[in-house]
């Protein structure tokens, strides 16, 4: 991420995603160690040490904050808990990183020097530790309050797109505001499951966090009031924390987080939907450094960015009808089969210095209109999640086809960081797309995923993805056991036309928990199976419509 061959903050969390599928041993400790890179102000260390859990203070006086960094830990943590059922991870404790940067990189702590150390302390000089839940809340709540003039989360130094780096004053990332809204809803969901499993009614949190838990629509509507709440919190813990903890009702906390998530999604639906002259629509993803909406049908042509579509789809902001319009618009303005699928953006036709350096690249190179594998895969993932399997498959297949076409891509098979305007694969070793591609094929296309430790089978395979025997199968590890899962589509139905009729495990028909389009194999049933063999699951698909 930083041009020096080292690992960046996002890498830590995306590597864990892949490991959870390929080699899950040790991931729990890795997660705990990674959380120690979070600061108490919700930002995080950006220089990663050579050892696991080692973070280095930035000595270059560069106080750059990537506003998306708080998103990724929750995505990985949720995936881990769903795969394992290990809700107790939420109550495990980790330290907080400390250096001279405070107030989310806007001020310097003049009282800090290296003799203080790199771990946050309380006023009593004791190392501050908080639960994983507390770390997640701080990352997502501080972001919720750090808004620009249009009440979306500020872009700051950049988001996932590192080249959106010239709008630190007035820039806003609507794209990742959606992601944070989704995270707040997901934390609420995990809290509900935690309460149900443990029987606990309260959680212990840093006393200062209470100010971030005000629940009031009038507050949410006001940029000024939000920034005041954030500043109060940042001031309260800018050098040391109080060291005090408070007990918070899980039920009230869950409700609080849902209200924030719902408010943010509704705000985006209401204000950020744009249309072209033919009434086809998509979401605006950004505001530039003049405070202007970036996307839409402008005097210089249509401006559309893929990132701004991925997260409203994935988080649930976009309605099904809006998704239909987004896919139509993306196919029209972003899709180019010759270069590997969905470009990151349309050609803005200007060097837009009030948004980022990306517009200084020639169109089709790097972040300016290349097919960026990571976001193209996440677009597919989001579409699959919402039941748009055909559209999701189109993005994945385009990347695969381009990678395999050596005459054009000039790369060994695999996923590069991006395909340029000539369709050539670039930076084969710099990609988080591989983790997400594997994740999407297994958990969405084949539909084998965890849900707080249960195994969910929810295939979203297209008719043409079954072989001549009408079968599609995969092998994987889940719950410390090896599995081969085979779907039988004897009636030759397409996704949306079939549902699960029968499930057998090692030749025995089982009573699965049925839903219209998925089967649930409970964790307690899985635990009774031996760990020494590859367990065979056969799933029979039969006529039955899925309603989107």
Language model regions located:
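Acidic, mature catalytic/reactive cores of soluble proteins
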Residues: 1-548
